[in-house]
């Protein structure tokens, strides 16, 4: 399978974006895919979520400025077939620095070329910053599709409408003519509440088959796992959160195979 690049993105924080990037990456690796997690969020929560410490100079920052090769920034994790390009605080300056450069929206795409050409990974998941700044737009420009986590709350659909506008602009300007939403996953679902069920129904009515069947539940174990530097499948495999992300990985795999 040629390398597929998927950006995990939502400009609203606290919707399960990084949780989804980390756990989907781990669950795809667990079904024998070679996965690279590219952490572009300066908060570096995906980096610590797979057990790596924040290390000065470890991020993709200098590569995005045109210095070096992204392959040299890839670090192994304790989890088989899962590798990571870490993030750290220097990425905070990326939006300002990239804005001054030529082809400033294509820097991540250019950085990923040697990764794609190497054939080393079947899937690259990008954990985007919780914003629609230049770094996130770079991730969009480099991606084959977007995976959008939506929290089961009242304002869930606001995020997707803004995302659609940005997608349209990137397609129309030729930055990424084929970019589309790969899938939408509902997160923090609480089946006991009327609101959660109503929001899921509303999103499914609006977005149809783009919405994954799997919903990610609210889960204490899911919330605990990052503090131990482990994806949920390696922290508590028999939890509801692990079961949900394993099912999501199967759905993602089906879509990837169909898209070939």
What feature does the model see in each segment?
Residues 1-260:
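P-loop NTP-binding core
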